């Protein structure tokens, strides 16, 4: 069973443009060690789905008692007209020891796009360590079919050599993103924009993943502590394509 959004449509007169087959799908929760719980655990256990009594928000709640990782998490989704959904994710760990000696946890979300105009993802970033900020068109490289892009100052995750989720953990050394937003161009002249309230802090970070036709992202927490609350805010926009500068401006407006 998938979590998240079953569909997302943009209506223009009599036309309907669908973004994905499933979106904001929390697919994996993983550690730095080989563990059967690294793969598809969010699909295997029940959620509570609640609607705000006076408001437009929907909450997807996973109780710690229903999580093999003993983590409780809540994703709040709120429509923001005319073309956006605001996302607020919060989590708390009852037993961090389950994540082992590497002491980090990753949450992985997938958006299974229906039809892409361009398989790459686009963001502001640097193409090498000493580069200046520019527009990056990111796609598979260095012989990898897929992989993950890091914030400019982030470090690659260390993981066991026999890990069963290496595909999701490995990352490209370059390019790096310098602003916490990306966009992906879809068929019918549409664009999906994802933006976040952080690049990287001392305890957590956002990562962009390239698994076309999915547009994915990860939230990684380092040094997980018992009962401490973690989380991030984000916005998803689905609208007709104009220019990449307008995508950047959408992030700036949301950030302010």
Identify what each model region corresponds to.
Residues 1-49:
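Acidic-aromatic substrate-binding/catalytic surfaces of carbohydrate-active enzymes
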Residues 30-84, 91-96, 100:
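Extended, loop-rich substrate-binding clefts of extracytoplasmic carbohydrate-active enzymes
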């Amino acid at each position: 069973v998938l979590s998240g959004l079953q569909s997302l449509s943009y209506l223009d007169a009599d036309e309907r443009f669908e973004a994905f087959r499933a979106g904001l799908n929390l697919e994996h929760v993983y550690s730095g060690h080989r563990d059967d719980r690294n793969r598809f655990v969010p699909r295997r256990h029940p959620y509570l789905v609640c609607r705000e009594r006076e408001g437009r928000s929907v909450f997807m709640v996973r109780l710690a008692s229903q999580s093999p990782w003993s983590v409780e998490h809540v994703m709040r989704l709120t429509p923001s007209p005319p073309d956006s959904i605001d996302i607020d994710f919060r989590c708390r760990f009852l037993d961090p020891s389950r994540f082992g000696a590497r002491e980090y946890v990753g949450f992985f979300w997938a958006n299974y796009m229906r039809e892409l105009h361009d398989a790459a993802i686009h963001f502001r970033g640097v193409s090498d360590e000493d580069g200046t900020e520019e527009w990056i068109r990111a796609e598979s490289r260095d012989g990898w079919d897929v992989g993950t892009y890091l914030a400019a100052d982030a470090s690659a995750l260390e993981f066991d050599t026999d890990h069963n989720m290496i595909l999701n953990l490995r990352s490209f050394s370059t390019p790096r993103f310098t602003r916490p937003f990306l966009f992906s161009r879809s068929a019918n002249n549409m664009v999906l924009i994802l933006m976040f309230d952080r690049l990287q802090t001392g305890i957590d970070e956002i990562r962009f993943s390239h698994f076309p036709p999915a547009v994915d992202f990860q939230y990684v927490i380092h040094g997980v502590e018992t009962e401490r609350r973690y989380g991030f805010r984000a916005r998803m926009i689905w609208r007709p394509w104009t220019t990449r500068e307008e995508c950047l401006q959408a992030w700036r407006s949301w950030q302010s």
